[in-house]
């Protein structure tokens, strides 16, 4: 294989590694769930883990239901899902 082909292969493998979400073995499965504000109408600042960006982001939680990917602090989110 030519050096250009090897360079292209290396680039594609690097891109794949960056875009592949962290496996659920590294954190609980609920960390893969999308942010869910729930049906209530409260305005509570909360955090959820975003698996594609591999970081915790803020969202508005309505105060009821939703899902387990919902944390009161960014530190709690990071300890649970981004560690």
UniProtKB/Swiss-Prot annotation:
<comment type="similarity">
    <text>Belongs to the venom Kunitz-type family.</text>
</comment>
<dbReference type="Pfam" id="PF00014">
    <property type="entry name" value="Kunitz_BPTI"/>
</dbReference>
<keyword id="KW-0732">Signal</keyword>
<protein>
    <recommendedName>
        <fullName>Kunitz-type serine protease inhibitor tigerin-1</fullName>
    </recommendedName>
</protein>
<feature type="domain" description="BPTI/Kunitz inhibitor">
    <location>
        <begin position="31"/>
        <end position="81"/>
    </location>
</feature>
<feature type="disulfide bond">
    <location>
        <begin position="31"/>
        <end position="81"/>
    </location>
</feature>
<comment type="function">
    <text>Serine protease inhibitor.</text>
</comment>
<keyword id="KW-0646">Protease inhibitor</keyword>
<keyword id="KW-0964">Secreted</keyword>
<dbReference type="InterPro" id="IPR036880">
    <property type="entry name" value="Kunitz_BPTI_sf"/>
</dbReference>
<dbReference type="GO" id="GO:0004867">
    <property type="term" value="F:serine-type endopeptidase inhibitor activity"/>
</dbReference>
<feature type="site" description="Reactive bond for trypsin">
    <location>
        <begin position="41"/>
        <end position="42"/>
    </location>
</feature>
<dbReference type="InterPro" id="IPR002223">
    <property type="entry name" value="Kunitz_BPTI"/>
</dbReference>
<dbReference type="InterPro" id="IPR050098">
    <property type="entry name" value="TFPI/VKTCI-like"/>
</dbReference>
<keyword id="KW-0722">Serine protease inhibitor</keyword>
<feature type="signal peptide">
    <location>
        <begin position="1"/>
        <end position="24"/>
    </location>
</feature>
<dbReference type="GO" id="GO:0005615">
    <property type="term" value="C:extracellular space"/>
</dbReference>
<keyword id="KW-1015">Disulfide bond</keyword>
<dbReference type="InterPro" id="IPR020901">
    <property type="entry name" value="Prtase_inh_Kunz-CS"/>
</dbReference>
<feature type="disulfide bond">
    <location>
        <begin position="40"/>
        <end position="64"/>
    </location>
</feature>
<feature type="disulfide bond">
    <location>
        <begin position="56"/>
        <end position="77"/>
    </location>
</feature>
